[in-house]
Amino acid sequence: MKKLFYGILISAGLISSSLLFAQDTEELEVKGKVLQSDQVTAFKTPVPVLNVPQSVSIITDDEIMMKGYRELGDIVRYTPGVNTTQGEGHRDAIVFRGVRSTANFYIDGARDDVQYYRSLYNIEQVEVIKGANALLFGRDARGGLINRVTKKPMIGESFRSVNAGFDSFGAYDIAFDSNMDVSDDSAIRLMLHSDTLENDRDHFDGDRLGLNVRYRTEINADSTLDLSYELVDHERFIDRGIPTSLTSYYPDSKFDDVVFGSPGINLQTTEADIFSA
C-alpha cells in the first residue's frame, strides 16, 4: 500500500513540474526575413520544416547582410554540420557531415553543379540541408545539399539599395539592387554586383561581375510568371596553396611570393548567359 501511495505521489509531482515548466517556457520568435518561416523551398514546392527528415539551417537575407557574407563559402564556415575545403582553388567544395561534394548545389530547387565560386548578390535565402536525401536528389546527396533562393521582383513596391565593402588586403565589392513597378500586376528587379579578390598571397587576384534582371507578372490570383536573365563573368588565379613539405621544413618562413604555376596561365574563367522561367 505504501509503494502504491509513493508511486501516486511521484506521478503527481512529475505532472505538476511538467505543467510548471510548460508555463515558464517562452514563446520562440523567428527573427529575420525568412521567405517561409516554417518551410523549405529546396524541394521545388514549399515543404514544412517538420516534414523534412533532415537537419535544416536557414540563412536569411538579413543575416547575409549583417555578417557581410560575400560568397557561399562564407556561409558554410559559420554553419554547423558542414565545412568548406579548398576546392582546388577554383570551385566550391563542401563537406556535408564528412562527405565531400562539388555538385550538391541547387538554386530555386534546380541543380546547379557548375564548377565555380557562387556569389550571393542576388540571393534572398540559403537553405543548408544536412543528411542523406538520395530519394529526391540522387545518390550524390548522401551527405546533404545547399539550396539558394533567388531574389524575386516584388509587385507593389519600389526601392533601391547600394552596398559596398573592402578589406585590408585591398579587395572591394559593390552591389546594387533596384525593384520597380511596371504596372499594377507586374514588377522588374535589377541586381548588379562587382568585386575584386585579394589576400595575403602576392599572386592571388581576380574579379567577378554579376548582372541579374528579373521580371514578374501576376497571370491570375493563383499564378505568377517569372522571367530571369543573368550574366556571369568570373576570372581568378587558381592558387592551390603551399605543399606541406615546405611548411614542415621551414615553419618560420613566409611564402607569400611563392606560387606553383604561372599567374598568367593558371586562371579560372566562368562566362555564362543564364535564362530561366
Enumerate the predicted regions with their spans.
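Outer-membrane beta-barrel translocator/receptor signature
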Residues: 122-124, 135-211, 219-223, 273-275
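Bacterial N-terminal signal peptides that target proteins for export
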Residues: 1-8
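Acidic/polar loop-and-plug regions of large Gram-negative outer-membrane beta-barrel proteins
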Residues: 195-199, 212-218, 222-276
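Acidic, small-polar-rich N-terminal luminal/periplasmic segments of exported/outer-membrane proteins
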Residues: 26-157
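Repetitive helical segments and hydrophobic/amphipathic motifs
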Residues: 11-12
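Soluble non-cytosolic domains of exported or imported proteins
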Residues: 58, 66-70, 169, 206, ...
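Short strand-loop junctions, especially beta-strand C-caps/beta-turns
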Residues: 62, 110, 165, 195-197, ...
